[in-house]
């Protein structure tokens, strides 16, 4: 939930369609699990042993995390908009 990806037209309440896979390319939008806890949908960019989680809304900060802290759940394919 939230509007961190509004710049990619992914709105609060949309249902994301995710293809389960752990591989990705930089700048793909992926579903990520952070610290075996929270799930988020962000663009990702890999830098050696760091990963940047990049929102498409400039009002949200980029999170830079050690790669071991995240699990790539899958790649974003599209969405279903309710309403």
Where are these regions (language model features)?
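Acidic/glycine-rich C-terminal interaction modules and beta/coil loop segments
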Residues: 1-83
């Amino acid at each position: 939930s939230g509007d961190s990806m509004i710049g990619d037209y992914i709105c609060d309440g949309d249902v994301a369609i995710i293809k389960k896979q752990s591989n990705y390319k930089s700048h793909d939008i992926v579903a990520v699990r952070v610290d075996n806890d929270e799930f988020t949908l962000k663009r990702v960019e890999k830098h050696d042993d760091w990963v940047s989680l990049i929102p498409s809304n400039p009002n949200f900060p980029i999170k830079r995390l050690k790669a071991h802290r995240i699990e790539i759940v899958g790649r974003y394919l599209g969405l279903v908009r309710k309403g």
